[in-house]
């Protein structure tokens, strides 16, 4: 079959992906081989493929494909996350477009809409990953709300509750007024904002004077129940034991004392609003202050405030400023910059709010999860993230796990008619416990009321490495014993606490061991200007359009060339173009080599070609060792670059040029076979990075058995490397490059044969056949002294010379070299001037001084060589 002149990914990618699926090459079942397991960070069902997914899943696929070729039983488990807040928001918006409000529906009616939306959209991103070449075991596709995962979540909730680690209580939480739910601390993003500091006058009861308070939130004065001063603050001693009147509101509140108050902030007087500030809440608890909740769940003012009822909180801030000023109770305002908490999900300002919620105690779980990372039982790549992890774990707070949403795992708590509640996985178990607790055998299920809230989405995904193998429902089953702990986790550092830390906690709590052995943290994908990719900036390309334009292999290569481990990626379409060009280079090299097949003859093995195939075979062995080492350190970008250079610079530019038969001449069968074998080994090394083109060409190389695939071919062990032989060949390459440079400088055509003189002894005599062919030499001669007028160069300590005879215009060459000599002498003077400057030598870094000294040595060497060459030419 004749290959097309140009590689067309569209002809190849769909064909081979379907072939891999048809032959179950992604599938995995427990057997006697060493397992290699990766669980996909489950993308949200609301999601479509973006550049972050592309990077993360390209890396996972590279690791999985490499493991298969190492003979491991590779299992990459895909799945999606139900994403409570994001999905519920999508469904609410869809219903709103149809004129339906969530509040008009029952829970069951709403969930029918949510499931329908999920069924329609939930699999989109996984289908898109196939375009990338992701070799997931699709038969194992899971969903965080499927039956097994849901049962696992409920069992863990009940277990942790029974262990005393889950409790219910009124606490200050982060409230999202748009999503109408509590958030964990980790779901709050703090942004720096330029606002105002308002100085408010609180009249001292029974006196004419005022106490002035500085606040960023004047709209919360309706919830003030105290003023607090620092007992050590000399400027506010006169307020001790007094009472003040809340401006506009008229409420009389006490002045309390606590050294928590910062004397330097504002006036040193603090308004205390226990229902709407975390620190004020703690003061309220300490001094038994009343708590007035002035906000409705949607961020409007509640009836409890007594004024501005129903207005939005930010509208009230504007209005209350005017009202305070009109009443003479606003002393002044100042520009002020502070950090404001935003909901990660809805991007609205969160509201600290007292709320009845469910919490998970974290101290015990954090203790068991910290040491394995700090001791490198679980390795982080890059290791710098260990410090981030430790900081989180040592400053951990209890996890608010309840959400005021319907889409998600409903909390398995059931309230009793007379108060109190029971916790159980099923209705039947709950009823049994309720009858026992109340002593009433006649209780019916309809007498119980299940908690309306659902669990934080992360409460299901923290069990992911265990629940995927059904380890919660069926402890010790064959799959959990075989696949767990998993091998590598590839994820972003932004969810190191949300997900990575919590999976480690769950792993040790429920399996008694780590959930994964290594964590590879990817960087953030940025554009070439260093900006984070986002829809609003319009700088985030559509991954599917990139694949259509450059091919999946081209895009994968572009991503990986710009992806140093753990550092941010500066992505540029030009890198995908480079990847596509590399595909064409591979394609054309294959066409060239296969084109020799019809011209094979029974000629003797050419000495130059024999040396070349021996050399490249050893280069492949050496490269295989280097690539394995880079994979072990997760330096995948460097591994790809090494293979790229091996193919482009050494296979194409050297091996093929040496073994290529002259036009119209046959190729030796042994040389052809060795070249094909080298090509096949290169395809195997490249396959994890570029699976489609490598599979296509591997199948074309020779006849294959039905169902055979490069992706399951063993890489094999590299052979012994003769370092001396490799070094001699490298020296030969340097000689060839130097002779070619002389031809270029002297404008001597390659068809004109030259002689090469070796002064003293030839250190690479064994390589003469290669040097002779690649330089078109009539002779290689060992001499005591080079010929007059010869152009020379040094390789190591050996001098080589090319006698030029009548091939050049001597006068013109002398003039050219004298001009170069003048330039180099001027350059040297500049370097020497810098090195003679004591200030420079005493203050510059050692590396900079060393670089200048190297410039001096190099310039002096070139000047000496030029002077000798000029003198030699003048003797001609």
Curated annotation (Swiss-Prot):
Tagged with keyword Protein biosynthesis: yes
Known catalytic reactions: tRNA(Val) + L-valine + ATP = L-valyl-tRNA(Val) + AMP + diphosphate
Listed SUPFAM superfamilies: Anticodon-binding domain of a subclass of class I aminoacyl-tRNA synthetases (SSF47323), Nucleotidylyl transferase (SSF52374), tRNA-binding arm (SSF46589), ValRS/IleRS/LeuRS editing domain (SSF50677)
EC main group: ligase
UniProt keyword annotation of Nucleotide-binding present: yes
Pfam family, one: tRNA-synt_1
Gene Ontology molecular function terms on file: aminoacyl-tRNA deacylase activity; ATP binding; valine-tRNA ligase activity
EC number: 6.1.1.9
GO cellular component: cytosol
GO biological process entries: valyl-tRNA aminoacylation
InterPro entries: aa-tRNA-synth_I_CS (IPR001412), aa-tRNA-synth_Ia (IPR002300), Anticodon_Ia_Val (IPR033705), M/V/L/I-tRNA-synth_anticd-bd (IPR013155), Rossmann-like_a/b/a_fold (IPR014729), tRNA-bd_arm (IPR010978), tRNAsynth_Ia_anticodon-bd (IPR009080), Val-tRNA_synth_C_sf (IPR037118)
Gene3D superfamilies hit by this protein: HUPs, Isoleucyl-tRNA Synthetase, Domain 1, Valyl-tRNA synthetase, C-terminal domain, Valyl/Leucyl/Isoleucyl-tRNA synthetase, editing domain
Predominant place of localization: cytoplasm
Keyword annotations of the record: Aminoacyl-tRNA synthetase, ATP-binding, Coiled coil, Cytoplasm, Ligase, Nucleotide-binding, Protein biosynthesis
Annotated ATP binding sites: 535
Domain notes: ValRS has two distinct active sites: one for aminoacylation and one for editing. The misactivated threonine is translocated from the active site to the editing site.
Known partners and oligomeric status: Monomer.
Family, as annotated: Belongs to the class-I aminoacyl-tRNA synthetase family. ValS type 1 subfamily.
Name used for this protein in its record: Valine--tRNA ligase
Gene encoding the protein: valS
């Amino acid at each position: 079959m004749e290959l097309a002149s140009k590689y067309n990914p569209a002809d190849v990618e769909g064909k081979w992906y379907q072939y891999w699926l048809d032959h179950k090459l992604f599938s995995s079942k427990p057997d006697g081989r060493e397992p290699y397991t990766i669980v996909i960070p489950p993308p949200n069902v609301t999601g479509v493929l973006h550049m972050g997914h592309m990077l993360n899943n390209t890396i996972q696929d590279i690791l999985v494909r490499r493991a298969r070729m190492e003979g491991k039983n590779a299992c990459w488990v895909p799945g999606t996350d139900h994403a409570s807040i994001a999905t519920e928001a999508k469904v609410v918006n869809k219903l709103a477009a149809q004129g339906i409000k969530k509040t008009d529906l029952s829970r069951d009616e709403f969930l029918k809409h949510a499931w329908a939306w999920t069924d329609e959209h939930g699999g989109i991103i996984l289908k898109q990953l196939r375009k990338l070449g992701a070799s997931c075991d699709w038969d194992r596709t899971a969903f965080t709300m499927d039956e097994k995962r849901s049962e696992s979540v409920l069992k863990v909730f009940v277990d942790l509750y029974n262990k005393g680690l889950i409790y219910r209580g009124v606490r200050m939480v982060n409230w999202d007024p748009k999503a109408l739910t509590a958030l964990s601390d980790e779901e709050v993003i703090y942004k720096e904002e330029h606002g105002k500091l308002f100085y408010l006058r609180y009249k001292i009861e029974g006196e004419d004077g005022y106490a002035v308070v500085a606040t960023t939130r004047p709209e919360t004065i309706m919830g003030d129940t105290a003023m607090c001063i620092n007992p050590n603050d000399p400027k506010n001693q006169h307020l001790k034991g007094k009472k003040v009147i809340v401006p506009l509101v008229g409420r009389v509140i006490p002045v309390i004392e606590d050294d928590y108050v910062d004397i330097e902030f504002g006036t040193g007087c603090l308004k205390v609003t226990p229902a709407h500030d975390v620190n004020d809440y703690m003061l309220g608890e300490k001094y038994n202050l009343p708590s007035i909740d002035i906000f409705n769940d949607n961020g409007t003012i509640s009836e409890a405030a007594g004024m501005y009822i129903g207005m939005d909180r930010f509208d009230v801030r504007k209005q209350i400023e005017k009202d305070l000023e009109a009443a003479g109770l606003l002393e002044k305002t100042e520009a002020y910059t502070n950090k404001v908490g935003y909901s990660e999900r809805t991007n609205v300002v969160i509201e600290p709010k007292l709320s009845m919620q469910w919490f998970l105690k974290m101290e015990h779980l954090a203790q068991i999860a910290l040491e394995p990372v700090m001791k490198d039982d679980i390795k982080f790549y890059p290791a710098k993230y260990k410090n981030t992890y430790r900081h989180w774990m040592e400053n951990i707070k209890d996890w608010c796990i309840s959400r005021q949403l319907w889409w998600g795992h409903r909390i398995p708590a059931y309230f009793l008619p007379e108060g109190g509640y029971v916790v159980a996985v099923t209705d039947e178990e709950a009823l049994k416990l309720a009858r026992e607790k109340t002593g009433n055998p006649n209780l019916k299920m309809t007498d119980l009321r299940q908690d309306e809230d659902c669990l934080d989405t992360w409460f299901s995904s923290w069990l992911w490495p265990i629940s995927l193998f059904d380890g919660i429902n069926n402890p010790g089953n064959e799959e959990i014993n075989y696949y767990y702990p998993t091998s590598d986790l590839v994820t972003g550092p932004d969810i190191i606490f949300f997900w990575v830390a919590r999976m480690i906690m769950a792993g040790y709590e429920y399996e008694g061991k780590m959930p994964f052995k290594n964590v590879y943290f990817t960087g953030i994908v940025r554009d070439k200007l260093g900006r984070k990719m986002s829809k609003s900036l319009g700088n985030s390309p559509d991954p599917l359009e990139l694949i259509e334009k450059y091919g999946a292999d081209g895009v994968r290569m572009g991503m990986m060339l710009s992806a140093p481990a753990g550092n941010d990626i500066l992505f540029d379409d030009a890198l995908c173009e480079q990847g596509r060009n590399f595909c064409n280079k591979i394609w054309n090299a294959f066409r060239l080599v296969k084109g020799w097949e019809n011209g094979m003859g029974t000629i003797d093995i050419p000495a130059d070609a024999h040396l070349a195939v021996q050399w490249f075979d050893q280069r492949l062995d050496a490269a295989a060792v280097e690539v394995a080492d880079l994979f072990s350190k997760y330096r995948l970008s460097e591994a790809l670059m090494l293979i790229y250079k091996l193919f482009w610079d050494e296979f194409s530019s050297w091996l093929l040029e040496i073994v290529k038969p002259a036009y119209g001449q046959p190729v030796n069968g042994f040389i052809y076979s060795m070249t094909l074998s080298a090509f096949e080994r290169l395809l195997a090394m490249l396959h994890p990075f570029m699976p489609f083109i490598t599979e296509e060409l591997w199948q074309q190389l020779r006849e294959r058995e039905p169902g055979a695939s490069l992706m399951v071919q063993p890489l094999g062990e590299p052979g012994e490397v003769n370092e001396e032989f490799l070094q001699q060949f490298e020296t030969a390459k340097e000689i060839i490059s130097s002779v070619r440079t002389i031809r270029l400088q002297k404008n001597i055509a390659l068809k004109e044969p030259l002689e090469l003189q070796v002064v003293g002894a030839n250190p690479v005599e064994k390589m003469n056949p290669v040097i002779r062919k690649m330089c078109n030499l009539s002779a290689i001669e060992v001499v005591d002294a080079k010929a007059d007028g010869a152009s020379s160069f040094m390789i190591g300590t050996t001098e080589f010379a090319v006698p030029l005879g009548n091939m050049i215009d001597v006068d013109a060459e002398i003039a050219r070299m004298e001009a170069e000599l003048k330039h180099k002498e001027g350059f040297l003077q500049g370097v020497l001037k810098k090195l003679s400057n004591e200030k420079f030598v005493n203050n510059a870094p050692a590396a900079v001084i060393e670089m200048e000294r190297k410039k001096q040595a190099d310039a002096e060497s070139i000047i000496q060589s030029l002077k000798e060459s000029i003198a030699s030419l003048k003797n001609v």
